Amino acid sequence: MGTSPRALPASGTLARLHSAILSWYAVTARPLPWRAPGTTPWGVFVSEVMAQQTPVARVEPTWREWMQRWPTPADLAAAAPGDAVRAWGRLGYPRRALRLHEAARAMTDRHGGQVPAEVEQLLALPGVGDYTAAAVACFAFGVP
């Protein structure tokens, strides 16, 4: 399923496309707190799990509350799973809160309390699929 080099646009075309996308983003990007400089990988991770099938407008206040209450994976891992479900609020699909709690425990147990930077390690966490792993790697660690 590879792409042959002949099928790719010329490098000048790619550079123009890249520039156009960045220009568009600079004008139209929404100011999301989890995209702000200084947001921890944990903050990015939590936002990506919360945003699965949930409108951003609902995610933002809950995300802020979670970051205040559980600023690290170890903080969430130490809480009762029921606390995570209750704090999930109106986000829907409350099993995601349980998966997030399980992921926090896995990070604490297997990754020294840190969000792993490798896509393969992210995929091994509960509740993390291809999109979430790629988004966390990109936005938290700058992996293209």
Residue positions per predicted region:
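Catalytic cores of DNA base-excision repair glycosylases
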Residues: 5, 11-15, 19-144
